[in-house]
Curated annotation (Swiss-Prot):
GO terms for molecular function: L-glutamate N-acetyltransferase activity. Residues 1-67 form a transit peptide. This is Probable amino-acid acetyltransferase NAGS1, chloroplastic. GO terms for cellular component: chloroplast. It comes from Arabidopsis thaliana (Mouse-ear cress).
Amino acid sequence: MTERGAMVVSSSTCYVPFRCPQARKDFAFVEPSKKLNPNRVLIKPPVYTYSPALTAAKCNIFDYAETGENLVGDKQFVRWFREAWPYLWAHRSCTFVVTISGDVLDGPYCDLVLKDIAFLHHLGIKFVLVPGTQVQIDQLLAERGREPTYVGRYRVTDSASLQAAKEAAGAISVMIEAKLSPGPSIYNIRRHGDSSRLHETGVRVDTGNFFAAKRRGVVDGVDFGATGLVKKIDVDRIRERLDSGSVVLLRNLGHSSTGEVLNCNTYEVATACALAIGADKLICIMDGPVLDENGHLVRFLTLQEADTLVRKRAQQSEIAANYVKAVGDGGISSFPEPLGYNGMVTTPNNHIGRPIWEKLSPTFQNGVGFDNGNGLWSGEQGFAIGGEERISRLNGYLSELAAAAFVCRGGVKRVHLLDGTISGVLLLELFKRDGMGTMVASDVYEGNREAKVEDLAGIRQIIKPLEESGALVRRTDEELLRALDSFVVVEREGHIIACAALFPFFEEKCGEVAAIAVASDCRGQGQGDKLLDYIEKKASALGLEMLFLLTTRTADWFVRRGFQECPIEMIPEARRERINLSRRSKYYMKKLLPDRSGISVVRTFQYDS
């Protein structure tokens, strides 16, 4: 039995560490013969009943623990683990396609990235890895006195380049397999696990010909040689390997119907795979962060915002121009106005508010593009980025942002662009509330906007049944009109399907959440959670530190989302004076964490650090 700086209990004795102040005091009253050593006190079981001194020592044990040399780190670890559990639960059994740039694979952080992937795999996340090879191919060519040739986004693959591509892909595959093979620490398994598993390999890695390719051919007079395009992803085999517990390693070498080996673009392979298998996320691990014009990390972009940023640079960026060509010129008009970071959305009257991914993601017909070759991307299975523009970084990470917007429009709801030179960036992005990279999302704040006068009828229709049941306080049309500026609505197909209100109390730095309501036929789709998250981000952007609410029927729903019951005295006085005590409402409050990924109340398209 070991001592860990806290009480250790066995069937016969209870030891209290001598350094505990209460234990030191009690130690003076212990007979000399019973003083086992100067570091601990032996208290026999009879004393372990209701001795006031011992009870005090037991009550103070965690106070003592807080002062321990190593226990500050322990407390932080426990706090982090508790904060991470919702994400652990949410990510389990999800499928992530991860592309790792050649710069990261060639750098000092490669081992840590792969170690984190192995860890996440054992937590139940399914991975398809698509490693980049551009850096390694160029290095091999340089060693042989050859210069790489790029035209647009693609490499011109002559015989020397193809040989280098084969060598680079093979070496990287072997390296990744080796890095994922070690199991966990034998010491930890012996201490907490099954010793029969001491010599098992860590992660099973499956690689092979998981996609078919075709030659790019001659384009605008340029013969691209053995450069390939993705023709078809073998979805069934990939899913079979993932379901069997393997990590799938998808190299950028494709095979044609005539048996040729073709060098394909890594991002085209990754994006095509993510779309074909219906991945939950595409994660791009790069050699740097996505920054705005002020040098601040861009933490979050809606699909509409990412699309807008890429389109604005179509005149100066060939990759951005190819994105516009791939997705069409008219796509942007079908979006709502930018959410920006302010929540002050102004939506055109003719906006059809159904989910962006429903409207812009025709069914993926593997092998013939989208919509049987007649859809938005009939000529491409994925979106290629590369060439001199990407290597030079003249436009930063615009090329990766274009790829992110492309797959979001195709149906992948979340894309994460991560700086692979940050140790643990994958864990920080997936398990921290604010993340550590840039997330592009097609499903966040879908249709959310500030309420307008013409929304009154829709809001009334949603809240009326809840008012009649007593779940919400009745509001007259005049009261609803006066409070309209505080309401947020969700619009779909021209109809209001959900609403909520935030009433700020700036002096007390808190706000009231009220009138959260979802149309009966839209419940169970997460609309309430989206509204609450939107309200929380807006409150944080307004400088508020707490949210409170009054409820009679929905306490459980709010408790599960971090609210705790509080006394009426914690409600701002100005609000307490207007409370109808006859409703016997319960009062709940939630402390807001600083949210750097939230919205800004400034009515401009900008990003806050």
